[in-house]
C-alpha cells in the first residue's frame, strides 16, 4: 500500500432519503451533501436515525425512498470503496493479526498488509493472535484492515466507545492523522460530543429522522484539548441535543 494520499474521498449526496420499518419512520426525507474528503461526525439521541444512516451508506440497508449517491453515481454501485468500523473490532480469533488485515484478499497482499499495520503502529505484532492484543490494539488492526482496501468512504460506528480514556484519545489522533494523509471521506457516529467536535470538520445532529443541526467546526488543526472554542462548540451541541420540542425548529447551519 502506497503511503501517499490514496484518493480524494467519496462525495456523498442524499436526496429526500427515507427509511421506514413498518409504521416506524426512522429517516424522514433527509437531504445531505458531504464533499469529498470531509470528516463529518453525527450525534443525537438513541433512536434518532444515526446508525440507520450509517447502515444505508454501508449498503447494509436500502432506503424506503430517495437516492443515495456518490457524486452522480448510486453509492451501491461502488460499495467496494466503502469500509466500516464498529465498536467491536470483529477480528477472527483463529487467524493471525496480519491474516485478519488481509481477510478476503487474493494474490500478493502481505506487503500491503504490513504497510497498513505499520501505518497504525502494529507491524511488529503481525504474527500474533488477536487474543494477545489490548482493546485499542484490536481497533488499530480493524483500522488497518479498512486501510488496505484504500477506501473512498470510511464509516465509523462508535469504534472507540469501549476504550479507556487515554487509548481513546490516541485512537482519535491516529484516525485524524490517517484521514489527513489519505483523503478519504469519514462519517463518524458517536454519542460523545467532545469527540465529535475534536475530530470533525462538521457535526450533524439527527433527530426524528431529519438533520436538526449542521455545525461547521472552524478550528485549525491540530486542535488543542481544553481550548475555549472547542468547549463552546461542545456546549452548543449538547444544549441542542437536550432541547425538547425540537421537531418544530428549523435546521440551523453555522460557518
From Swiss-Prot:
GO terms for cellular component: plasma membrane. Residues 12-233 form the ABC transporter domain. Part of the ABC transporter complex SsuABC involved in aliphatic sulfonates import. Responsible for energy coupling to the transport system. It comes from Escherichia coli O6:K15:H31 (strain 536 / UPEC). It is a peripheral membrane protein. The complex is composed of two ATP-binding proteins (SsuB), two transmembrane proteins (SsuC) and a solute-binding protein (SsuA). Gene3D superfamilies: P-loop containing nucleotide triphosphate hydrolases. It is an enzyme of class 7 (translocase). This is Aliphatic sulfonates import ATP-binding protein SsuB. It comes from the Bacteria.
